[in-house]
Amino acid sequence: MARIAGVNIPVHKHAWVALTSIYGVGRTRAKAICDEAGVPRDRKVKELTEQELEAIRTALGKYEVEGDLRRAVAMDIKRLMDLGCYRGIRHRRGLPVRGQRTQTNARTRKGPRRGPAGK
């Protein structure tokens, strides 16, 4: 398996599809990275030369991906929570942040139902 950005990417897939297995790289960015590195999109990862892999690593180095991106997102959410703004409070309480209704639905964000207290 080829290792790019600390992730083992699948070797039997096309280069651009395999790049999407990296956190922070979607379809558009994966295609842009392949174009920037000069790698044909339809070439399988196992067919890539070491120079092409290095070119992909260099092109990918310009973006914030994997651990750095996860850390940045976590810090952004923590900053909102520390500020005490509306979005931060919603994060803190585990409720939907973007204005969705909560009287019904919102089960994904709120977690499983709590039943009645019993006797």
UniProtKB/Swiss-Prot annotation:
This is Small ribosomal subunit protein uS13. Keywords: Ribonucleoprotein, Ribosomal protein, RNA-binding, rRNA-binding, tRNA-binding. Located at the top of the head of the 30S subunit, it contacts several helices of the 16S rRNA. In the 70S ribosome it contacts the 23S rRNA (bridge B1a) and protein L5 of the 50S subunit (bridge B1b), connecting the 2 subunits; these bridges are implicated in subunit movement. Contacts the tRNAs in the A and P-sites. Part of the 30S ribosomal subunit. Forms a loose heterodimer with protein S19. Forms two bridges to the 50S subunit in the 70S ribosome. Belongs to the universal ribosomal protein uS13 family. Gene3D superfamilies: 1.10.8.50, 30s ribosomal protein s13, domain 2. InterPro entries: Rbsml_uS13_C (IPR027437), Ribosomal_uS13 (IPR001892), Ribosomal_uS13-like_H2TH (IPR010979), Ribosomal_uS13_bac-type (IPR019980), Ribosomal_uS13_CS (IPR018269). It holds the Pfam family Ribosomal_S13. Residues 94-119 are annotated as: Disordered. GO terms for molecular function: rRNA binding; structural constituent of ribosome; tRNA binding.
